[in-house]
Amino acid sequence: PGETPPQAFRTPVHCAEMSDDGLVYDCDRPSNRISIFQRDGTFVSEHIIAPATLSQGSTWDLDFSPDEAQTWMYLADGQNMKVYVIRRETMEVVYSFGDGGRQPGLFFAVHSIAVDSDGNIYTTETYEGKRIQKFTFMGMAEVSGNTGAPWPADRRRGGD
């Protein structure tokens, strides 16, 4: 942490996803870095996520929101046990959800992430997590920071 990221990937790339506008996003997990390239391999930019993360890094897998502009990127971070919601145009982390644990909405090494056409988010966990979770899209709202576990549902609605 705190050092200039290497010019090359530290290990084999852990994820590579193409957005609808033809940009390729990759996860350089141990460098806590998402690199963006054109289809022809031309470098566009790189972005460090959770720079103080040690060990296995913060960038495990990513996917995009289903809207036409793919406004949002969802990033699985197995080391810090959360999902980041990132504004794709600026690569700003808007908020995150999750924490370490085995209850619904918590993660034990969230490893993979996918978003369906309705905006529902699916995550898988590795090591001893060994499960899939579905986070149902319920609309847009202003949030920031780490919202913690999106569970139980009755807490979100004020207990009704």
Describe the function of each predicted region:
Residues 1-160:
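Eukaryotic scaffold repeat domains enriched in small/polar residues
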